[in-house]
UniProtKB/Swiss-Prot annotation:
Belongs to the ATPase C chain family. Mitochondrial membrane ATP synthase (F(1)F(0) ATP synthase or Complex V) produces ATP from ADP in the presence of a proton gradient across the membrane which is generated by electron transport complexes of the respiratory chain. F-type ATPases consist of two structural domains, F(1) - containing the extramembraneous catalytic core and F(0) - containing the membrane proton channel, linked together by a central stalk and a peripheral stalk. During catalysis, ATP synthesis in the catalytic domain of F(1) is coupled via a rotary mechanism of the central stalk subunits to proton translocation. The record marks E124 as: Reversibly protonated during proton transport. This is ATP synthase F(0) complex subunit C2, mitochondrial. The gene is ATP5MC2. Keywords: CF(0), Hydrogen ion transport, Ion transport, Lipid-binding, Membrane, Methylation, Mitochondrion, Transit peptide, Transmembrane, Transmembrane helix, Transport. The modification N6,N6,N6-trimethyllysine is found at K109. The chain crosses the membrane at residues 82-102, 117-137.
Amino acid sequence: MFACSKFVSTPSLVKSTSQLLSRPLSAVVLKRPEILTDESLSSLAVSCPLTSLVSSRSFQTSAISRDIDTAAKFIGAGAATVGVAGSGAGIGTVFGSLIIGYARNPSLKQQLFSYAILGFALSEAMGLFCLMVAFLILFAM
């Protein structure tokens, strides 16, 4: 069975068939400037095979590809927004560590507070950066 399928589907046949079926034939036929009749369609089929028409197709976008692009935008923006939640967790960790450090050694209050403010600023900056990237993905692309 495997040997039979190996003879029936050669790599070149699979490649040409998949290229042929990837775009509708109407896009190729409409690209030609001459008016097509039944005789010209039959001469078109005889003179140049469909595999040669595949190479003459230009880039086109469809509604499906635009929907896929929109979905990819939303997925990317959602993934970038996850960083904002990480920023909130980082801020909570910074101030939790401040409270624990102050409870262990109250004499270092000023130094601990300055480090906590620095940690808060860095966490908040990363959160704002993630939010900015999410908005760039949504509205600038």
